[in-house]
Amino acid sequence: MGQKIISVIGGSGFIGSYLIDKLLELGYYVKIISRKPIAKKNFYPSAKLGQYSLISCNVCDTKKLDKVIEGSFCVINLVGVLEDKKKNSFNAAHIQGSESIMKSCKKHNIQKVIHISALGVDKNKTSKYAITKLKAEKNIKKVQNSIIIRPSIVFGYEDNFLNFFANYAKFSPFLPLIGGGRTYFQPILVSDLVQIIIASINKKFKDGQIIEVGGPDILNFKEILIFLLKELKLKRYFINLPFNVASKVAFFLERLPVKLITRDQVEMLKTDNIVNKKNSYKKFLQYECNSFFIAAKKQLKFYKKNGGH
């Protein structure tokens, strides 16, 4: 294979840590690009001496990004924010950031550009997150040899999904069901998403191809919580919060230092998060994802009795 260079933008997070370790295991040299790069010993157990570099760069800084990605044959964009903050807004992270990536990749004729988006962004017309993520997709599609990967909700040992609700359920007798908990998801294990990203690096697709990714199990939010409580052997009470009520509650929760949920996230829950067969990864790649029930069961063992994070 040789020492090919892959630049991973927004590589310091949950998905990035798994992806980068796998890329290192495969022998790539990886440039880890982030506003605030983080290096932890347990992040990259596959790393060899001098096999990766941590680079501080704001994705909106096109001039610096130009220099940083130069020499890369592949650029993977993982940038995404779930809260619209002044210092890191949806507009900056998603729209301006993707414009910057698009310009830099065009300038350097990058051989492969992989943009990680999210399922449902093309259907939800009220969430700022969805609207800006869709605009980001349109920017990246202007680059030759680009693909868009839209995963459903991603889970794994360090996630902010199962871990959040497992911790919440341990201390609260009540669990909220926004919109009655009827929003459907197709949860995908982080290691499966990583394998699909890696399988896409050297595969030829039409420019701007959309690939939707989800696990084999489709279940709604209430069913996910019922499964979680069963695994933790906890009895909790559900509170049904219609979307309009949840939005009002979120308005006040947004004023807390730690935001449990935002109004925009309530808007996102109005759209199901499942794969469209027309763009399913199974049309392009031969790969079987892990069952949510089996993988999540292993993950939740940490929370039983004296377990937990």
Regions found by a protein language model. Give the residues of each.
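Conserved beta-loop-beta element that borders a ligand/cofactor-binding pocket
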Residues: 117, 137-164, 169-171
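Residues forming the Rossmann-fold NAD(P)(H) cofactor-binding site
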Residues: 16-18, 95, 134
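Mid/C-terminal beta-alpha module of Rossmann-like enzyme folds, strongest
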Residues: 200-262, 275-309
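Substrate-positioning beta->alpha
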Residues: 160-162, 180-201, 209-212
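SDR active-site strand-loop-helix element
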Residues: 9, 33, 78-79, 113-119, ...
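NAD(P)H-binding glycine-rich loop region in Rossmannoid oxidoreductase-like domains
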Residues: 48-99, 104-107, 119-123
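N-terminal Rossmann NAD(P)H-binding glycine-rich loop of SDR-like oxidoreductase domains
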Residues: 5-26
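N-terminal Rossmann-fold cofactor-binding loop
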Residues: 33-38, 58-59
